[in-house]
Design a protein with these regions (language model features):
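Conserved ABC ATPase "signature" region
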Residues: 111-129
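Conserved ABC ATPase signature
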Residues: 133-137, 141
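A short, flexible loop at the N-terminus of ABC-type nucleotide-binding domains that lies
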Residues: 1, 9-21, 28, 69-71, ...
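The feature captures the beta-strand-to-loop junction immediately N-terminal to the Walker
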Residues: 35-37
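Hydrophobic anchor residue at the start of the ABC signature
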Residues: 147
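Helix-to-loop junction immediately C-terminal to a conserved catalytic motif
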Residues: 50
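Conserved ABC transporter NBD signature motif
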Residues: 58-66, 75
Length: 157
């Protein structure tokens, strides 16, 4: 289970709370939609879960373990994330290398890495884009590459 437990978030001390005493939990395999108006904190919740932001108070728990102060690179072992603007995260020379970047940094090599990339590309119908430069793709194709990158990491959440 992945949880936000009584989390309060503000961008800096002295500024108003963006989120106040929020508690949410996510079970493995559960699909959750966080909806609301612009600026209501949807992206902030995902940034807190992934470690891209730190709460002012409260905890982020992974199977009961406090991971609040862990870096995003540590949390990427169990949390996958697709950015709203995927072109901001793409910097590899080919789609295949872009998709392989995360699993490679998780320690996957050789056949294990190739299998993760091939499966993610098949699941997102991006095989034909394998040798393309990600930043020149259409926004829709960039989004599919970003989804493939998250899938290739084979995270729990």
């Amino acid at each position: 289970m992945l949880e936000l437990s009584h989390v309060t978030f503000r961008y800096a001390e002295g500024l108003p709370d963006i989120l106040k005493d929020i508690s949410l939990s996510f079970d493995k395999g559960e699909f959750v939609a966080i909806t609301g108006r612009n600026g209501c904190g949807k992206t902030t919740v995902t940034r807190l879960l992934t470690g891209l932001e730190k709460p002012a108070s409260g905890q982020i728990l992974y199977h009961g373990k406090d991971v609040t102060r862990e870096e995003p690179s540590e949390r990427s072992r169990f949390i996958g994330y697709v950015f709203q603007q995927p072109d901001r995260q793409m910097f590899m020379p080919t789609v295949r290398e872009e998709i392989a970047f995360g699993p490679y940094h998780q320690g996957k090599r050789g056949a294990e890495l190739e299998e993760a990339v091939a499966r993610a590309m098949q699941d997102t119908d991006t095989e034909a884009l394998a040798e393309e430069y990600p930043r020149i793709l259409s926004r829709g194709d960039q989004q599919r590459v970003a989804i493939a990158s998250a899938l290739a990491m084979d995270t729990e959440y």
